């Protein structure tokens, strides 16, 4: 499930840029809504780089309590904390030596730690808690957020100098509503993944595929992934049908068969509708999702 699906023009541009900068040491700043696949892209960049054999260390800045964030990120020396590791602890920044440090949800990093992170980014060194001598590391940085850091800078909750230091190579990952042509291929990918995981042989009805193409995925790729996993497990028949969908889906979208009217749409929207119809026709003329993906 960590494979990135690249079929739409929007994702092709993202993927091409990511591959182009993968071997550089420049800091990459991933932006996008929740669930668009920022961590998947970060891992793809790492695995496409010369650092791929070294560690990929993820730091979820929103999940680690503020009280222990500094010790988790930078480590501490022997005897620094009562109840801590008696021999001290190596921090996540040091664990990422020669590899990639992925700073997820960077907008949640406490203001008091942002100066120390800035030093790490600028000098590739930091001082663990309780130590005097700094530790030098060779690390590639990738940061990600779904928040607007420019607004946070204006509000005084995020350092301006850190923002510009992170914003070297910005990559914005489109939402699923901006890459609807990827949805059939994502469905196929997740269906194969969960069939393999649970040793099942589920298929999916073409009406469900079109329903999902039309649906507004507020949780983006992650929501689609979770939905496919749930349907693979709960559908009683081998083929997943519209009747297997939860009430949430049935209330949110009215599913219609056949063509889609272009009345009242601008040129871009009409083109999107046309591309969607081509995808649907490809699916309908194929026996399986795998065959459709080849076409």
Swiss-Prot record:
InterPro entries: AAA+_ATPase (IPR003593), P-loop_NTPase (IPR027417), Sigma_54_int (IPR002078), Sigma_54_int_dom_ATP-bd_1 (IPR025662), Sigma_54_int_dom_ATP-bd_2 (IPR025943). Residues 4-233 form the Sigma-54 factor interaction domain. GO terms for molecular function: ATP binding; ATP hydrolysis activity. Keywords: ATP-binding, Nucleotide-binding, Plasmid, Two-component regulatory system. GO terms for biological process: phosphorelay signal transduction system; regulation of DNA-templated transcription. This is Uncharacterized protein in HyuA 5'region. The lineage of its organism: Bacteria, Pseudomonadati, Pseudomonadota.
